């Protein structure tokens, strides 16, 4: 598959270079049909091979695979049509440009086919890991030796398959550290499993021995932790292997067991919080409190595991903030319960308890969403929750529900503060000046509105007939929701709500499965939450659809919205029927089917609504225009205020400026002269991205400066590495000048040179007697080849899109990765050569 991918990448690169060269030189373009026919054959063969593997693909990805395969064939057909058009009218540049577009689409879809298959394999592997973990938990519950032997056999079978598949995944990693880590964890799983099973047998032989039970529990905990570490490392390998690729769909990563536990514990905690007042009335308050504390502690402990693993510093900061909030609220809840338990008629105590219950529920929901979301989605989810609280406050006041209004209002100040804090954290990840300005303005607006909302809400609650207060509150809430909408984009809101809808649907099914006297009450509440989330998701998607100008893409988004709209009443009806009679198997079957389709529709909507590069550019353009307008207004005001003073001292200022310019010019000329003396052979290009790429090339040159360049394999390898550094520097210069052909040519030269480097390095490795040094050389050989192929694909596919921040980041990351691989390859080859010279001659 990789060979086919590289072959198609080379063919696409050649086609792009040929067409670009013809356009630049204004020459007659030759017949591309024969070459396109070869591309078409390779593409169709790959698509057919992918379709034959449908039976082996997880059902979640079958639709994506079939759709991508179909698009791939269509793109190949379109490329052929454009090639024929270009042959019939060789001076017409339009079909040539259409051919470039179709060729790039082919390459993107080929990459997607590979990724879809990999995702499916990972999901199967993770499911095996979770089944093995469930078996480990069941072993801890068994005290009959025969039953234990049966369960151990099942677990061993799962773990053997898990280790075998893990080793296969490690072989596909481009990162030596992750590959080694996965192998070590797989070994640890085997060791801990044997120890745990032996301990479980000891317990069966001596069931009353508490020491043995304690040892079994300790080993079980370590084994489950190791299995979860294995799942997390598999996720990291996939993310590391695909960080250079723009996915056409939003990949929904598999969840670790710690992430699953956060979600499950949140559902238990929220269920207990909702029924807490009834439990207190029935005299079960202390027992309910214990359940709440246990669920909160379980959610917090697993969330801490997720936070400690998190490699994104901004997301980690957000997670720790959410964890601290739930930690703070749990003892507050217990304290608020005590006066109610002592005096159930204390209205003030009851009101305070309900406020703390509401805040704790919100904190738990937010944490459950955050562990499986990106920083932008965490902020969007917080904004959705805050906007819903504001709407609920207004509705409660309008309906005269003073008690509920007071409960919601008690939570809103801290909710606004929390949202502002999360938005400020998100600012750390944003470099676009327009977007930063927009978010800062929205934060300032929320800070201004917060005291006004509290004041007007208190007035309206105290006097429902105070129409002025209600009018002002409505206006303030409208402004606050607008500010919230300026912090998070609609597509981020849709993705955040997709996570919440999935979590709530899973909790609903779990609630029905567990039954109990409060099942219907809990189920109705889940149904309300789900319906509200779907409504908000549709509203956000419709708002974004109105901004889309591409008719085909707009239709795709609207079709996805319509599909979710149709399913919503079906879902609510299925929930109603199942809650009315949980034992009705047909009703349950319908509910499971509708839940599955709603999840798919919600996920599909969150995928198709993700913005294209053109849409992101348009958003950026509008923000920049707004900044320019504001800056122009501010400058005009400043000029009007300073005009009189400037006229009075204009002569003195002009003289100062003239002298300063002369002095500055002298300094500039002197600095330029000094710079010319020290200047490298290549001029450092302008722009942070181009400088970063040039810097990566300079790192290679500096690292090799003192190396010997002779006719030995190591000397030849160093000379070839010099050539790679030279071509990387040229890519930076070509990118600065917008030279597409130059970038592609330089990338291809790097790929060709890397192959020569690999030849020399493998020669050194073959003659090295130290296995560890030999493996290091071969590892960095593979890394260099992977990075050069990714660079070649990136320059071919994204060559016209380098104003896109994502493309810029990918170019810099790829250049730095290639630089590091080349430097480490030379170092490891040098070490291997030294080891070789120490071998005595025969």
UniProtKB/Swiss-Prot annotation:
Any single GO CC term annotated in Swiss-Prot or TrEMBL for this entry: adherens junction
UniProt keyword Acetylation, yes or no: no
Record keywords: Actin-binding, Cell adhesion, Cell junction, Coiled coil, Cytoplasm
Domain of life: Eukaryota
Tissues of expression: Epithelium.
Stretches assigned to coiled coil: 585-679
Entry keyword Cytoplasm: yes
GO molecular function: actin filament binding; alpha-catenin binding; beta-catenin binding
Knockout-associated phenotype: Cytokinetic defects when knocked out with mhcA. Aberrant epithelial organization and localization of exoc6. Mis-localization of myosin in the tip epithelium causing actomyosin ring malformation in stalk, which appears significantly wider. Distribution of Golgi and centrosomes not polarized. Abnormal intracellular distribution of dcsA.
Family of this protein: Belongs to the vinculin/alpha-catenin family.
Subunit architecture: Monomer. Associates with F-actin. Interacts with aarA, ctxA, ctxB and rgaA.
Biological role: Involved in cell adhesion. Thought to play an important role in cytokinesis B, probably by providing substrate adhesion and traction forces. Required to organize and polarize the tip epithelium during cytokinesis. Required for the normal distribution of myosin in the tip epithelium. Involved in the localization of ctxA, ctxB, dcsA, exoc6 and rgaA. Thought to form a complex with ctxA, ctxB, and rgaA which regulates myosin accumulation to the apical plasma membrane.
Protein name stated in the entry: Probable vinculin
The species this protein was found in: Dictyostelium discoideum (Social amoeba)
């Amino acid at each position: 598959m990789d060979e086919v991918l590289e072959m198609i990448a080379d063919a696409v690169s050649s086609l792009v270079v040929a067409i670009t060269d013809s356009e630049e030189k204004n020459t007659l373009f030759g017949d591309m049909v024969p070459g396109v026919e070869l591309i078409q054959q390779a593409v169709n063969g790959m698509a057919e091979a992918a379709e034959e593997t449908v039976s082996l693909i997880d059902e979640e990805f079958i639709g994506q695979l079939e759709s991508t395969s179909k698009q791939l064939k269509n793109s190949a057909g379109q490329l052929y049509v454009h090639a024929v058009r270009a042959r019939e009218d060789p001076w017409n540049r339009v079909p040539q440009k259409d051919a470039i577009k179709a060729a790039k689409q082919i390459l993107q879809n080929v990459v997607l086919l590979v990724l879809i298959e990999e995702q499916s394999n990972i999901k199967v592997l993770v499911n095996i890991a979770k089944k093995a973990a469930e078996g480990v938990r069941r072993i801890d519950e068994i005290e009959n030796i025969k039953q234990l032997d049966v369960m151990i056999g099942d677990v061993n079978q799962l773990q053997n398959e898990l280790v075998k598949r893990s080793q296969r995944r490690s072989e596909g990693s481009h990162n030596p550290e992750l590959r080694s880590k996965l192998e070590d964890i797989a070994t640890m799983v085997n060791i801990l499993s044997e120890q745990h099973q032996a301990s479980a047998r000891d317990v069966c032989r001596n069931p009353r021995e508490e020491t043995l039970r304690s040892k079994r529990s300790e080993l079980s905990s370590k084994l489950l932790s190791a299995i979860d570490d294995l799942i997390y490392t598999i996720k990291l390998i996939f993310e590391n292997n695909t960080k250079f690729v723009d996915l056409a769909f939003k990949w929904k990563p598999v969840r670790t067991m710690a992430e699953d536990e956060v979600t499950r514990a949140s559902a238990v905690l929220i269920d207990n919080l909702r029924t807490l007042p009834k439990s207190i009335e029935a005299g079960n308050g202390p027992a309910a409190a214990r359940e709440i504390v246990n669920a909160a502690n379980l959610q917090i402990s697993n969330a801490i595991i997720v936070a400690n693993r998190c490699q994104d510093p901004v997301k980690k900061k957000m997670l720790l903030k959410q964890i601290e909030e739930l930690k703070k609220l749990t003892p507050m809840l217990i304290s608020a319960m005590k006066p109610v338990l002592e005096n159930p008629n204390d209205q003030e105590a009851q009101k305070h308890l309900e406020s703390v219950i509401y805040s704790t529920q919100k904190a738990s929901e937010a944490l459950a969403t955050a562990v499986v979301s990106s920083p932008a989605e965490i902020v969007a989810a917080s904004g959705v929750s805050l906007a819903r609280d504001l709407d609920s406050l207004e509705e409660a006041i309008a309906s005269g529900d003073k008690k509920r209004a007071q409960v919601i209002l008690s939570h809103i100040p801290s909710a606004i503060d929390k949202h502002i804090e999360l938005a400020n954290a998100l600012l750390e990840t944003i470099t676009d000046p327009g977007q930063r300005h927009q978010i800062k303005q929205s934060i300032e607006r929320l800070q201004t509105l917060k005291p006004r909302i509290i004041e007007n809400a208190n007035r309206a609650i105290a006097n429902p007939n105070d129409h002025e207060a209600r009018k002002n509150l409505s206006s303030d809430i409208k402004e606050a929701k607008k500010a919230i909408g300026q912090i998070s984009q609609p597509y981020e809101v849709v993705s955040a709500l997709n996570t919440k809808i999935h979590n709530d649907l899973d909790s609903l099914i779990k609630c029905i499965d567990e039954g109990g006297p409060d099942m219907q009450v809990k189920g109705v509440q889940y149904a309300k939450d789900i319906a509200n989330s779907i409504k908000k998701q549709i509203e956000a998607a419709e708002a974004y659809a109105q901004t889309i100008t591409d008719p085909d893409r707009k239709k795709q988004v609207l079709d996805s919205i319509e599909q979710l709209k149709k399913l919503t009443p079906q879902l609510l009806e299925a929930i109603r029927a199942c809650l009315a009679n949980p034992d009705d198997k047909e009703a349950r079957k319908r509910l499971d089917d509708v839940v599955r389709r709603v999840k798919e529709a919600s996920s599909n909507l969150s995928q198709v609504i993700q913005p294209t590069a053109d849409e992101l550019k348009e958003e950026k353009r509008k923000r920049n225009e707004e900044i320019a307008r504001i800056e122009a207004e501010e400058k005009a005001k400043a000029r009007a205020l300073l005009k009189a003073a400037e006229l009075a001292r204009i002569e003195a200022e002009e003289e100062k400026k003239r002298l300063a310019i002369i002095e500055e010019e002298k300094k500039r000329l002197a600095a330029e002269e000094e710079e010319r003396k020290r200047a490298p052979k290549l001029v450092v290009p302008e722009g942070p991205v181009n400088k970063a790429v040039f810097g990566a090339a300079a790192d290679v040159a500096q690292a090799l400066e003192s190396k010997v360049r002779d006719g030995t394999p190591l000397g030849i390898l160093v000379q070839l590495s010099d050539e790679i550094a030279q071509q990387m520097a040229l890519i930076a210069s070509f990118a600065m000048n917008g030279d597409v052909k130059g970038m592609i040519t330089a990338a291809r030269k790097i790929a060709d040179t890397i192959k020569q480097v690999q030849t020399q390095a493998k020669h050194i490795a073959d003659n090295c007697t130290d296995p560890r040094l030999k493996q290091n050389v071969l590892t960095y050989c593979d890394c260099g080849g992977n990075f050069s192929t990714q660079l070649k694909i990136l320059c071919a596919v994204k060559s016209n899109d380098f104003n896109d921040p994502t493309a810029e980041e990918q170019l810099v990351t790829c250049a730095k990765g290639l630089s590091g691989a080349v430097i480490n390859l030379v170092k490891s080859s040098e070490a291997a050569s030294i080891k070789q010279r120490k071998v005595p001659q025969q």
